[in-house]
Amino acid sequence: MNFQNTNKPSKVVLSVGDESGIGPEIILKALYSNEIPENIEYILVGSKKNLQNTYENLRSLGLENLANPKNLKIQDIEICPSNNDPKSSYGDSSFQYLKKAIEIVKQYPNAALVTGPICKKSWSLAGHYFSGQTEVLAKSCGVKNVGMLFTA
């Protein structure tokens, strides 16, 4: 996919992952970057409240290079409050974020999906028995052979 040579904004949908984990922090740091092309539209899927709380907590620790959630397009799905306990509610939240992100990506033929980290134990506690996000994508898209790319 060539983001640089298009007249329309390309869409990148970001599922924030487990909101009690590092996903929200990673996304807020990444979207602050001045290296992001202007013709890309980012759509975050997650809890607007949690992203705002993460932003405020990180700012209170002295971190400045963060995207302000108030300036981001967020598909708000408020399922549970955030803490650092791998409860089933957090597993269900991250699973629902991924399902919604997949739904959005399917609407746009040139869209990309970025997934934040999840807690597989929380998914299991919530009754979502997939070995990972790649398998959810495969099932949602009706394919048998899948692959995953991890980059940092």
What positions do the PLM features span?
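Ligand-binding beta-strand-loop-alpha-helix segment within the catalytic cores
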Residues: 149-152
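Contiguous, glycine/small-aliphatic-enriched amphipathic segments in soluble metabolic enzymes
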Residues: 1-140
